[in-house]
Amino acid sequence: MQNPEPTREEVNALTGATVLEFGASWCGYCKAAQSTINSELANFPNIRHIKIEDGKGRRLGRSFQVKLWPTLIFMKDGVELKRLVREIDAGELKSGLALISAHQAGG
């Protein structure tokens, strides 16, 4: 059974650093990005990672205006600071993770 998708209100209420990963299990771009995403996230254990199966009629993806997969949204205390779309570059991913991680200590 699939976990229920969080609401936009629940996502906006999250504290700390969060990466939302929108995609689909059958998406080739999503599959190709998984090793890069997983290896970079392993270096930032303090960052919450939420994978969201996206598609037609999925409200959370629409509320973030997700159009291509994968889309990674880097958030701090419910506020989007950066996003990566489709071609996930390891350097850009690391930069986004460092951005939200750096905000952990200082607030």
For the regions a language model picked out, list residue spans one by one.
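The canonical Cys-X-X-Cys-His
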Residues: 27-30, 72
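Short hydrophobic/charged patches on amphipathic alpha-helices used for structural packing
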Residues: 8, 58-61
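Structural micro-motif
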Residues: 64-73
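Non-catalytic, surface beta->alpha helical segment in thiol-disulfide oxidoreductase systems
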Residues: 73-107
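N-terminal "domain-start" segment that seeds a small globular fold
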Residues: 1-10
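Typically the conserved alpha-helix immediately C-terminal to a functionally engaged Cys/Sec
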Residues: 29-43
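Short active-site neighborhood of thiol/selenol oxidoreductases, capturing the structured segment around
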Residues: 13-25
